[in-house]
Each structure stands twice: as structure tokens, then as C-alpha cells.
């Protein structure tokens, strides 16, 4: 039997949820209840609503994105680079019983001050599908990421995503 879990991408303006049994997605849902659009509801209430009939206390929930920011449910501290890919899963922030937020990543050097929140989970998926030394991650806040087989070394946010949107 493969483990059942819920994956959440909870950004500023949208919330997307997937129910998995192992590697198979059983169902997905989405909402416009991003962390800046809760309209007076608590994050716990919004989570309960979007995962209704999916979850018992034993079903883990792993969330990524702005839910871990200073405007989200609870701050999940950034993981500074360089960092091992495995460090991401070891730095989860608990927000409830069997509910966690994945940390974002940060770079702080004289030539680069940058953060990502949510894209780190896309990076884990990209690495699992096609290991590389450079990852180009399109989206609203497009990232270029430099890594090796074990570690993430650097990333840059580039304007191309904003130009597209």
C-alpha cells in the first residue's frame, strides 16, 4: 500500500490542492483563497474546506508557497544557499497535526540577494524528472537555478516571467 498525502500550493492569490495515493493524483481542487484573500477566514478553516472529505488525522498535508511567508499561516524560515536538496525536506515547519510548510530558499551575497517560495518544490520535481546543473523555471517570477547532483548553489529571478504576464 502506498502512502496517501495532500500536496498544497498556496500562493498570494490562489490555492491549489492535490490528493495523492503514492504517485497517483486521485483528485485536485483550486480556489481563489490565496493567503492575501482569506476574507476574514483562518488558514485552518480554508484548508479544512479545500480538503473536505480527503483528510483524516493520519493523512499528511505538505504545503508550499506564500503560506509560509510573513502574510501566510506561519513563517517557514528560508533555507540559505548553498543547501543540499535533502535539506528542504528536513526543515519543514509544523502548523498543525500532520500539517507542514516547506521552507523557501534564499541567497544573500554581495552580488545577489534573492528569495523563492514555492518554486523550490518545482525544483525538486524537475530534479527528479531530469537532473541538471541549470534549471529554467518559468512563471510569474521566473527563476534560473544553478545546482549540482547534491546541492542548490544559486538562483536568480529574471524579468521574463513578468513580461509574459
Language model: regions and residue ranges:
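Short glycine-rich, Thr/Ser-proximal phosphate-binding strand/loop in the N-terminal lobe
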Residues: 4-42
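Short glycine-aspartate micro-motif
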Residues: 5-9, 60-62, 133-137
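Gly/Ser/Thr-rich loops at beta-strand to alpha-helix junctions
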Residues: 11-16, 67-69, 140-143
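Short amphipathic alpha-helical segments
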Residues: 19-20, 74-76, 147-150
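Glycine-rich phosphate-binding loop plus the immediately following alpha-helix
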Residues: 38, 106-165
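Short, well-ordered amphipathic alpha-helical segments that serve as non-catalytic structural scaffolds
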Residues: 41-54
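Short beta-strand-loop/turn "lid" adjacent to the catalytic site in phosphate-handling enzymes
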Residues: 54-116
Amino acid at each position: 500500500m502506498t502512502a496517501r498525502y495532500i500536496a498544497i500550493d498556496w500562493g498570494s492569490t490562489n490555492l491549489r490542492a492535490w490528493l495523492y495515493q503514492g504517485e497517483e493524483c486521485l483528485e485536485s481542487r483550486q480556489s481563489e483563497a490565496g493567503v492575501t484573500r482569506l476574507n476574514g477566514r483562518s488558514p485552518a478553516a480554508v484548508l479544512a474546506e479545500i480538503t473536505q472529505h480527503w483528510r483524516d488525522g493520519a493523512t499528511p498535508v505538505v504545503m508550499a508557497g506564500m503560506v509560509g511567508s510573513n502574510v501566510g499561516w506561519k513563517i517557514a524560515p528560508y533555507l540559505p544557499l548553498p543547501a543540499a536538496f535533502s535539506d528542504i525536506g528536513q526543515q519543514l515547519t509544523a502548523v498543525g497535526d500532520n500539517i507542514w510548510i516547506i521552507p523557501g530558499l534564499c541567497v544573500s551575497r554581495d552580488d545577489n540577494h534573492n528569495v523563492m517560495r514555492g518554486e523550490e518544490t518545482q525544483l525538486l520535481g524537475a530534479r527528479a524528472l531530469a537532473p541538471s546543473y541549470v534549471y529554467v523555471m518559468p512563471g510569474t517570477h521566473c527563476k534560473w537555478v544553478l545546482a549540482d547532483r547534491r546541492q542548490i548553489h544559486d538562483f536568480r529571478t529574471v524579468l521574463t516571467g513578468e513580461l509574459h504576464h
